[in-house]
Regions:
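Short, basic, glycine/proline-bearing loop/turn elements
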Residues: 50-62, 118-130, 267
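Short, flexible active-site-proximal loops enriched in glycine and acidic residues
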Residues: 83, 112, 153
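A gly/proline- and charged-residue-enriched helix-loop-helix capping module
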Residues: 106-146
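Active-site loop segments of alpha/beta catalytic cores
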Residues: 133-357
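A short acidic, glycine/proline-enriched capping/turn motif at secondary-structure boundaries
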Residues: 90-93, 108-109, 118-119, 161-163
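N-terminal basic, low-complexity leaders that serve as flexible interaction/assembly modules and, when applicable
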Residues: 11-105, 242, 341-357
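Short, flexible, mixed-charge acidic loops at enzyme active sites
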Residues: 48-50, 99-114, 167-180, 290
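Short, positively charged and aromatic/hydrophobic N-terminal segments
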Residues: 3, 7-10
């Protein structure tokens, strides 16, 4: 434990060589836009596939701190992004609470048990120490920070309560999450109890990541868009707001994919940065948000299937549409696994070469 605290104190005091991301998030002056990609540490890189191929699969990689740290750093060296994001998965939280999951090849996550009744809340435990059950994530953060040696910031993350609720009640991925949404109508008391528990654990988890050395954190609400405006306000934003209000130790980003009807409410959250998906017009969203928030995004991930010239053109078109220097460049969603890494480099280099007006 003393060793871990010594490492933490070292990195708290360490100056970040490339702190563009953090300055952009705080609204400070930047000489160019910072750029990174969601899912940058992943299957687009042969080097990642080599590390994963030596293990039993994705979960073992997530749960092995040394290897998770290794693939976290790969995009910094190979792609030249301005930030690292810890290699992990949003589903480590429900597993820590009591619902184990498996990742089925070509199908995605699958839970043997689900929570659809009050009795099943035994699988939503909150009375545990984060380091005991999720220490492999915080250890990966410590190792990655040591290896990064202050080159770029390290981002931690978690799933938003509504998205985690979807998996804990549906038991697998879904286009509609009808079982999850049904509970909102048939047993809203259960829904709020489960969301409350997820929120409690998520706050502790994000704080643990920051304590381990994460310089910034992001909350992913991947399934925000399947709810209507009123439902998302009650079952999504209410709990997202609790999280952003509780996290004040580091800049925080919220990414509520598809929640267009709730744009004004999202803009009012006490966060530093708001992620924007590719279906949202960035100029319109900036008008809603104003100048007091940083925006992140929002190139269509499929643009990276285009020619290098087209990637450069579309990236410049996006950059020219920004109305503010308060911006972190990213895709509007995670990079797809079959994208050519060279196209990703074209995207990144185009951003780096762009002159802010």
């Amino acid at each position: 434990m003393i060793y871990k605290w010594l490492i933490l104190l070292t990195f708290v005091a360490m100056k970040i060589e490339n702190d563009l991301l953090l300055r952009a998030a705080r609204g400070e002056d930047i000489e160019r836009y910072p750029v990174w990609l969601m899912r940058q540490a992943g299957r687009i890189l042969p080097e990642y596939r080599a590390v994963r191929g030596a293990l039993s699969g994705f979960k073992e990689l997530v749960e092995t701190p040394e290897r998770a740290a290794e693939v976290t750093i790969q995009p910094i060296d190979i792609l030249g992004v301005d930030a690292a994001i810890i290699f992990s998965d949003i589903l480590v939280v429900p597993e820590a609470m009591g619902l184990e999951y498996q990742l089925i090849e070509k199908k995605g996550p699958w839970f043997e048990k689900t929570i659809r009744s009050t009795d099943e809340l035994i699988y939503a435990n909150t009375n545990f120490d984060i380091e005991d059950r999720l220490g492999y994530v915080t250890e990966a953060i410590r190792i990655a920070n040591k290896e990064l040696n202050g080159r770029v910031p390290l981002i931690g993350f978690a799933g938003a309560p509504w998205t985690i609720f979807c998996y804990m009640t549906e038991g697998q991925g879904s286009k509609t999450f009808s079982e999850s949404r049904k509970i909102l109508y048939t047993n809203p008391t259960l829904a709020h109890e489960l969301l409350d528990r997820i929120t409690e654990v998520t706050i502790k988890y994000l704080k643990a990541q920051i304590n381990a050395g994460a310089h910034m954190v992001q909350v992913f609400d991947s399934w925000a868009g399947i709810l209507g405006e009123r439902q998302y306000e009650e079952f999504g934003l209410k709990y997202m707001e609790r999280i952003v209000n509780a996290i004040n130790e580091a800049p925080i980003t919220v990414f509520a994919k598809g929640a267009y009807a709730s744009a004004h409410k999202i803009a009012a959250l006490n966060c530093n940065t708001i992620g924007v998906d590719w279906n949202t017009d960035m100029r319109t969203f900036r008008d809603i948000v104003g100048e007091n928030k940083t925006l992140q995004g929002n190139l269509d991930p499929c643009v990276l299937y285009s020619s290098h010239n087209e990637v450069e053109k579309m990236t410049n078109n996006m950059l020219n549409s920004f109305k503010s220097k308060r911006h972190i460049v990213n895709l509007g969603h995670g990079v797809y696994p079959d994208v050519d890494p060279e196209k990703v480099k074209t995207f990144i280099n185009t951003v780096k070469n762009f002159k802010i007006k």
